[in-house]
């Protein structure tokens, strides 16, 4: 059996790079002794960063309402268009794109198909075994797993370095929802996303600013997500646009994996043994 590492094979790597320090401002010209004295300059402004917007409880409640609705969905299909910026050493930004199609049947079935110009990856989970398949190379790896979908993303990331697309969709509406360490939360009004009126919210957590557009009305589905990395002075962003199909009729075979002819099994390599 072939042994390969799978660390980060599903992640779209869009991290920013370091930058040279900015040029300091020029010193002011000297004042001539023959000139009349000018009025004393104003006191310098504080160098402290401006205070963030307060945490609006209504914005947090909107996330909780969205999460509660997501937890009611037994089957759904989410199609995601992802674009993300990579920052070069000289500060120039490159935009990369990928797509993902995620089919879900709660509590424990999933099929995710991820595609970009650089790679193709399929992740299949039937409630007993999780399989990673590389269709272009015809390699597949599998590991036993029996937990629900809200635990799948974290376990794959922690043990194998595999990133599940839109993994937070399974956490919203649970005690594990990422609501901690918020320093800013605000309602930014309404926008239209692909013809659908959405409520626009903005949040700050640590070195991350993120915005979410949630469909207005009885089905508060997340339609668009923008994440900004504040730890990088270039502020690179990733943008996810999500299209939904609710209650599709999946056959059980959708979540089963049969190795194609000529496919080779490759052993999962946990991160701790790499």
Where are the language model's segments positioned?
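Post-signal peptide N-terminal segment of mature Sec-exported envelope proteins
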Residues: 23-55
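Bacterial signal peptide processing site
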Residues: 18-20
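C-terminal motif of bacterial Sec signal peptides marking the signal peptidase cleavage site
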Residues: 14-16
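Gly/Pro-enriched, hydrophobic low-complexity segments
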Residues: 81, 116, 131-132, 141, ...
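Bacterial N-terminal signal peptides that target proteins for export
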Residues: 1-8
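N-terminal mature ectodomain segment of secretory-pathway/periplasmic proteins
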Residues: 54-139
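Flexible, processing/modification-adjacent segments and terminal tails
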Residues: 41, 49-50, 54-62, 90, ...
């Amino acid at each position: 059996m072939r042994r390969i590492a799978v660390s980060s094979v599903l992640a779209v790597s869009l991290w920013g790079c370091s930058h040279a320090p900015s040029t300091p401002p020029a010193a002011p010209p000297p004042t001539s002794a023959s000139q009349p004295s000018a009025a004393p300059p104003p006191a310098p402004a504080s160098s402290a960063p401006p205070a963030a917007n307060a945490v609006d409880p209504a914005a947090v409640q909107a996330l909780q309402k969205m999460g509660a609705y997501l937890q009611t969905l037994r089957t759904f299909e989410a199609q995601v268009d992802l674009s993300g910026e990579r920052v070069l050493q000289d500060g120039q930004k490159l935009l990369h794109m990928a797509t993902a199609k995620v089919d879900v049947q709660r509590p424990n079935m999933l099929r995710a198909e991820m595609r970009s110009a650089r790679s193709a990856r399929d992740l299949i989970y039937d409630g007993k075994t999780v399989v990673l398949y590389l269709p272009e190379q015809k390699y597949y790896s599998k590991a036993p797993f029996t937990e629900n979908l809200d635990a799948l993303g974290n376990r794959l990331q922690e043990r194998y370095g595999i990133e599940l697309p839109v993994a937070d969709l399974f956490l919203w509406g649970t005690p594990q929802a990422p609501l901690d360490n918020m320093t800013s939360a605000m309602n930014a009004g309404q926008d239209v996303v692909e013809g659908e009126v959405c409520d626009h919210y903005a949040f700050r957590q640590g070195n991350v600013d993120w915005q979410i557009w949630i469909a207005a009305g009885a089905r508060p589905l997340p339609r668009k997500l923008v994440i900004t990395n504040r730890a990088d002075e270039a502020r690179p962003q990733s943008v996810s646009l999500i299209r939904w199909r609710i209650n599709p009729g999946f056959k059980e075979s959708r979540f089963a994996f049969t190795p194609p002819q000529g496919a080779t099994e490759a052993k999962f390599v946990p991160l701790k043994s790499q």
